[in-house]
Regions:
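N-terminal secretory signal peptides that target proteins for export/translocation
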Residues: 1-6
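Alpha-helical interaction segments
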Residues: 7-8, 240
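Bacterial N-terminal signal peptides
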Residues: 8-20
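Phosphate-group recognition and catalysis centered on beta-loop-alpha active-site segments
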Residues: 20-285
Length: 285
């Protein structure tokens, strides 16, 4: 009799368990360039703000100086819209500057005009990856770090293989093998890292609708697919999950986008305003 009752109610029990698991699952928050909406992007103040806000992951971009130092910057050149350089600066290209020359630039002197809430913090310098990794003891957050590679401009970055070697050296130095995700639109650095250190998690960044999520991860060796938020549908997310992939869209800053991504059951969200996203997710539970 007991067995009959168990079999009779098994479908309902499975459904209830699935609902409970879905309710308990947490969508992780990645602070895009730290917290670009409110602080100078890719800066120590932005990362410190994001840590205080309670992010799960610090997201950032990397460039390489003339003397082969990894620094945190989205662009291969210094952007005069919010970075002020010395009067005698000979170049704006990071790869053509030594670290000492790069540190003369002030990237907090002017707020980014694209983000009205962003606070200017004069004296903010471009941090090295070493300096950002030194924040690791401040919490249990991970790092999602992007190799900025420009195939049409090979002179502004090292080779993909050299880039991966430099990144791995910093990961090893800080013993962060379990806390770092390497992401890129250029899969050459992902494949290079897979060959050097298969234990490092890899994320395939996707920007175009014609890119197949699952095939892109097969091609790059990634277990994380990171599409533009506009490419996300529940069906694509479900297919990625069925293939064993984690889905981490970028860059979502509006409540309407967050609602859509939650409904699509993504695993994490990359946002310029991580504090607002965290508050939204807490309120919507």
């Amino acid at each position: 009799m007991l067995m009959v009752m168990i079999l009779r109610f098994a479908p309902a029990l499975v459904c209830l368990c699935w609902i409970a698991m879905a309710a308990d699952s947490k969508i992780l928050v990645h602070g895009h360039r730290g917290a670009r909406a409110v602080m100078p992007e890719n800066s120590l103040p932005a990362f410190e703000y994001a840590i205080q806000a309670g992010v799960d992951v610090l997201e950032l971009d990397m460039a390489v100086t003339k003397d082969d130092v990894l620094v945190v910057s989205h662009d291969p050149e210094m952007n005069p819209a919010y970075c002020a350089g010395p009067a005698n600066a000979k170049t704006k290209v990071i790869r053509e500057m030594t670290l000492a020359e790069l540190k003369q630039w002030d990237c907090g002197a002017k707020a980014n005009p694209g983000f009205p809430k962003q606070k200017a913090i004069p004296g903010t310098r471009v941090p090295t990856l070493d300096e950002v990794f030194a924040l690791a003891p401040r919490g249990k957050f991970d790092f999602n770090i992007e190799t900025k590679i420009f195939p049409q401009r090979p002179s502004v970055t090292p080779t993909p293989e050299r880039f991966a070697e430099l990144v791995l050296a910093q990961i090893r130095k800080h013993k962060l093998e379990r806390r770092v995700i390497l992401q890129s639109f250029d899969f050459r650095t992902l494949r290079a890292m897979r060959n050097l250190a298969p234990e490092i998690r890899l994320s395939a960044l996707l920007a175009f609708p014609q890119q197949d999520w699952i095939q892109s991860c097969k091609d790059s060796g990634a277990t994380i697919v990171s599409p533009n938020v506009k490419l996300v549908t529940p069906e694509k997310v479900a297919a990625a999950h069925a293939a064993g992939l984690t889905v981490v869209p970028w860059t979502a800053n509006e409540a309407t986008e967050w609602k859509m991504l939650v409904a699509a059951q993504v695993d994490a969200i990359i946002s310029d305003d991580p504090a607002a996203l965290i508050a939204y997710l807490q309120h919507s539970r």
